[in-house]
Amino acid sequence: MAPGLFSVRLSEEVSTALADHRPVVALESTIFSRLGLPSPHNEEALDRCLNAVRSGGAVPAITAVIDGVARVGLGPDEHDRILGADAKTSSRDLGVAVGAAWPVGVTTVAASLRLASLAGITVFATGGIGGVHRGAANSGDVSADLGALATEPVVCVSAGAKAFLDLGGTLERLDTLGV
């Protein structure tokens, strides 16, 4: 277990890798759920990502809330649970997801960075980060991902901000936050 306001359960593989000082890469789980990609593309993406991390010599650590427990590292027998999940969990939702014993909460970039940090993992990979939404000047719609990137001591490897966002606004916000 990692320290924090709630416990974080590490898989045996992730725990052993960290104890042995081997590389571990945290992964979000929203993209692998039906909230991120339709089936069967979500399962194919999951397999490709896990294989890519392993072929690079690291241990993949999928983050999620499973049966009310914040998890870092899932076994193959748990993959179906995230593939079919429909409850997205951001960093603000982690305490609720754990306290209310959500059956499955797939994690956003912000939640994944938080769980990775609590677990002592310093590298996180994702396809795209959230950012400043178009029209944010009126709506205030800015992803929690940006705040997490600024505050969690975890390197994020990503293709960049999602294309539907206000990319200029996202870059400005990242600059303001010192990212």
Please annotate each region the language model reported.
Residues 1-55, 118:
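N-terminal glycine-/serine-/threonine-rich phosphate-binding loop
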Residues 25-27, 60-65, 98, 104-106, ...:
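General beta-strand structural signal in soluble alpha/beta enzymes
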Residues 114:
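C-terminal binding/interaction regions
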Residues 119-179:
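Phosphate/pyrophosphate-binding betaalpha-module
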